[in-house]
């Protein structure tokens, strides 16, 4: 009996062999990964992006080992190695008070160079785009989706109010302010401001090298990177890090939202460095860190509003041929470090479910995606406010006794997850549950289905 090697976690199908035509809307990290994963599983992809070029806004993001486990299967590992060459080499996380006293030090397991990565968003998006082009995926820029449609046999979009595209399904990866979500939900979900915002910036370290008062941060340049988090009461915290072994400086200042922050990376106009510095001017460590922060280029700084969103009632349209994934379905607060990773997990899941269900069962495939992903992403999404609450007013005496109280949780069920293997193993069970109308409990969630502060992931 011949075994189809494409029906395996690392398997690659013959291009266009499934007969399934997919429209991917939005080419952020989730959208680019979806386009690539769908191509690898034999689907014909049309990928649409309203911007004229790949957007490179934003600073760094973390991809845990659960995300890089997907990327490592591309081109025999070459793409992941290319990304790692562009990534930061953060091997130490430090937690300090506003005077600079060190209370906790942690390795970067889950995000370290051996498995995950911390990488500039622009570098990641550009590399994924180049790989998608190499695969000859149909990518169309300047293609704003102005409408959606579906019936029992097909689905599609209207581009720029004129062109009508026909496909078997539409996958909306168009982010927090998703247009595709309008085709799924009868009303836009309520976004609840968290009361917090974060100044964010990333820039080249060259000018810092020449500043005797600032270059202390580059003491390990060429060797490794380090992330130091200075924390005070009231949720005020400064994260200061080097990147690419000292080639870059990245910093974030978490603070109370003064209503000047914006939830769009493209909005830099209201972000003023002096406003950020004024918030920490009373810190004992101020005179040490301010020389570094003053090198921030005006165009590199943004003040990003943090918004809480509850899990959506569904990700799938009424006729079952349009689905939203990634930030369009389950945006995650940045403190969790899983926004990009969960989008990548979604991408792998939807590509495999379409492959296993086949062209005549598109609706079943998308239902399977939701059943496999919904509980996991909802639990991870809910962890953001909990993690933030844990560091908002640090109890330094308790932390001195138990440093894990202040460190980012690294649960094994998140970081040790192998999404391709799980989807191939679980799809028959999910399919049966859908066909029988019975319940299905995914295997990718923690016992009890609740988020807990765990540090049980081991590399």
UniProtKB/Swiss-Prot annotation:
Entry cofactors: FAD
Any Pfam family the entry gives: FAD_binding_3
Residues forming the catalytic site: 200, 230
EC number, as in UniProt: 1.1.1.-
Annotated FAD binding sites: 49, 62, 121, 327, 340
Pathway(s) per entry: Secondary metabolite biosynthesis
SUPFAM superfamilies, per database record: FAD/NAD(P)-binding domain
InterPro entries xref list: FAD-bd, FAD-dep_Monooxygenase_BioMet, FAD/NAD-bd_sf
Enzyme class: oxidoreductase
Keywords: FAD, Flavoprotein, Monooxygenase, Oxidoreductase
Gene Ontology MF, one: monooxygenase activity
UniProt family annotation: Belongs to the paxM FAD-dependent monooxygenase family.
Entry function: FAD-dependent monooxygenase; part of the gene cluster that mediates the biosynthesis of the benzazepine alkaloid nanangelenin A which contains an unprecedented 3,4-dihydro-1-benzazepine-2,5-dione-N-prenyl-N-acetoxy-anthranilamide scaffold. The first step of nanangelenin biosynthesis is catalyzed by the indoleamine 2,3-dioxygenase nanC which produces N-formyl-kynurenine through the catabolism of tryptophan. The two-module NRPS nanA then utilizes anthranilate (Ant) and L-kynurenine (L-Kyn) to assemble the dipeptide product nanangelenin B.
Alphabetized PANTHER family for the sequence: MONOOXYGENASE, MONOOXYGENASE, PUTATIVE (AFU_ORTHOLOGUE AFUA_6G12060)-RELATED
Protein's UniProt name: FAD-dependent monooxygenase nanF
Gene from which the chain derives: nanF
């Amino acid at each position: 009996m011949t075994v189809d090697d494409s029906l395996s976690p690392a398997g690659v199908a013959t291009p266009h062999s499934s007969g399934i035509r997919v429209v991917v809307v939005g080419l952020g990290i989730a959208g680019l990964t979806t386009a690539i994963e769908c191509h690898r599983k034999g689907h014909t992809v049309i990928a649409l992006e309203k911007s004229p070029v790949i957007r490179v806004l934003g600073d760094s993001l973390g991809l845990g080992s659960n995300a890089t486990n997907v990327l490592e299967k591309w081109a025999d590992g070459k793409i992941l190695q290319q990304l790692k060459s562009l990534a930061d080499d953060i091997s130490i996380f430090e937690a300090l008070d506003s005077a600079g006293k060190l209370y906790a030090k942690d390795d970067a397991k889950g995000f370290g160079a051996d498995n995950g990565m911390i990488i500039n968003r622009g570098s990641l998006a550009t590399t994924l785009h180049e790989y998608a082009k190499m695969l000859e995926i149909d990518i169309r820029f300047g293609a704003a989706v102005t409408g959606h449609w579906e019936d029992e046999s097909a689905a599609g979009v209207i581009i720029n109010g004129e062109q009508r595209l026909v496909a078997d399904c539409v996958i909306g990866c168009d982010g927090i302010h998703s247009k595709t979500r309008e085709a799924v939900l009868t009303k836009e979900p309520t976004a609840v401001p968290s009361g917090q915002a974060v100044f964010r910036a990333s820039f080249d370290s060259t000018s810092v090298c020449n500043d005797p008062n600032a270059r202390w941060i580059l003491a390990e340049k060429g060797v490794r990177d380090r992330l130091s988090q200075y924390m005070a009461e009231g949720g005020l915290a400064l994260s200061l890090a080097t990147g690419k072994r000292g080639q870059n400086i990245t910093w974030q200042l978490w603070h109370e939202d003064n209503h000047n922050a914006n939830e769009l990376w493209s909005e830099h106009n209201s972000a003023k460095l002096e406003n950020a510095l004024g918030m920490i001017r009373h810190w004992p460590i101020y005179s040490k860190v301010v020389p570094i922060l003053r090198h921030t280029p005006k165009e590199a700084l943004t003040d990003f509003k943090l918004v809480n969103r509850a899990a959506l009632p569904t990700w799938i349209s009424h006729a079952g041929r349009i689905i939203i994934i990634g930030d369009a379905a389950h945006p995650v607060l940045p403190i969790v470090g899983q926004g990009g990773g969960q989008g990548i997990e979604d991408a792998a899941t939807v590509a495999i479910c379409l492959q296993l269900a086949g062209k005549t069962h598109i609706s079943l495939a998308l239902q399977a995606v939701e059943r496999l992903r919904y509980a996991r992403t909802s639990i991870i999404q809910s962890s953001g406010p909990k993690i933030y609450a844990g560091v908002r007013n640090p109890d330094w005496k308790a932390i001195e006794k138990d440093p894990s109280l202040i460190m980012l949780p690294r649960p094994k069920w998140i970081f040790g997850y192998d999404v391709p293997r799980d989807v191939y193993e679980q799809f028959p069970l999910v399919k049966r549950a859908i066909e029988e109308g019975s319940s299905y409990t995914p295997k990718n969630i923690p016992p009890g289905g609740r988020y807990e502060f765990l540090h049980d992931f081991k590399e």
